[in-house]
């Protein structure tokens, strides 16, 4: 614990593991099972509950509560965990719950993530690396969020939904179906509105890859054939495009929810200029 500073008003329970150069601010409460990585900073009134691991160089702001029991009536109080990766920024009032003993028992958050004020991550979620949740984002239990996803303020995600990597969800949207990688979903009842072109460019996709994915996703949702045939056609048409392969694999790994699709039957994905 070399270089670690704990404010005299903070309560660090016996058994808690704190790394080097950790700062624990006024009125924080850290549970006996918590593991706090090197270089972490906990500002005032942060609560770390249960078996919660916070990765190195993460910063947690006032009144965040990490590792509380899940809000799940099936949970019977068993041993469950919350794991948060390194270099995460967790702003004021954020809540993240441990997994439930009626499911996988683990809530997992990746590295380099940003969670703005009052965002909520429920039990048994898996959140990837480099994601950004704006203020008041709420994701329900068992949700999977891929790498580099951005979710706008006030958006909500239904339980068991999968959000593919590099996807974007607009503010105050309610996503109730699986969103494909690179997809953009907007609306109070969110629909697939196009592709996250900015995210694709940030990911280093070349122009040819972007155009291939545009065409592939338009094929998927043109409703001219049964959906399984459309998926097969896309896979055959673009076997060398990794972005298309990612979308096809995402669809084949079907979860418990339906897919987020365009608004009207027969609508195509917008062929926006880049």
Swiss-Prot record:
Localization of this protein: Cytoplasm
EC number: 2.3.1.129
Annotated metabolic or biological route of this protein: Glycolipid biosynthesis; lipid IV(A) biosynthesis; lipid IV(A) from (3R)-3-hydroxytetradecanoyl-[acyl-carrier-protein] and UDP-N-acetyl-alpha-D-glucosamine: step 1/6
Enzyme class: transferase
MF terms in GO: acyl-[acyl-carrier-protein]-UDP-N-acetylglucosamine O-acyltransferase activity
Primary location recorded for the protein, binned into one broad class: cytoplasm
Annotated NCBIfam families: lipid_A_lpxA, PRK05289.1
PANTHER family hit by this protein: ACYL-[ACYL-CARRIER-PROTEIN]--UDP-N-ACETYLGLUCOSAMINE O-ACYLTRANSFERASE, ACYL-[ACYL-CARRIER-PROTEIN]--UDP-N-ACETYLGLUCOSAMINE O-ACYLTRANSFERASE, MITOCHONDRIAL-RELATED
Protein name: Acyl-[acyl-carrier-protein]--UDP-N-acetylglucosamine O-acyltransferase
């Amino acid at each position: 614990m070399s270089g670690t500073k704990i404010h005299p008003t903070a309560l660090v329970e016996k058994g808690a593991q704190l790394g080097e150069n950790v700062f624990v601010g006024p009125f924080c409460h850290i549970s006996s099972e918590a593991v706090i990585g090197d270089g972490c900073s906990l500002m005032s009134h942060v609560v770390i509950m249960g078996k919660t691991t916070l990765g190195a160089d993460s910063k947690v702001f006032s009144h965040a509560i990490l590792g509380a029991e899940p809000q799940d009536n099936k949970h019977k109080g068993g041993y469950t965990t919350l794991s948060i990766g390194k270099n995460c920024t967790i702003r004021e009032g954020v809540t993240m719950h441990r997994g439930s003993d009626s499911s996988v028992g683990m809530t997992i958050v990746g590295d380099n993530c940003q969670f703005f004020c009052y965002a909520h991550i429920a039990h048994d979620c898996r959140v990837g690396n480099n994601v950004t949740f704006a203020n008041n984002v709420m994701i329900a239990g068992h949700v999977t969020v891929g790498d580099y996803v951005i979710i706008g303020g006030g958006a909500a995600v239904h339980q068991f939904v999968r959000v593919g990597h590099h996807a974007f969800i607009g503010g105050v949207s309610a996503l109730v179906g699986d969103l494909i990688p690179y997809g953009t979903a907007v609306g109070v009842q969110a629909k697939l509105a196009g592709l996250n072109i900015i995210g694709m460019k940030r990911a280093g996709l070349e122009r040819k890859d972007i155009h291939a994915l545009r065409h592939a996703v338009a094929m998927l949702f043109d409703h001219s054939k049964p959906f399984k045939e459309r998926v097969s056609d896309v896979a055959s048409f673009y076997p060398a495009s990794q972005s298309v392969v990612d979308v096809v694999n995402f669809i084949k790994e079907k979860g418990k929810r339906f897919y987020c699709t365009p608004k009207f039957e027969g609508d195509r994905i917008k062929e926006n200029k880049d």
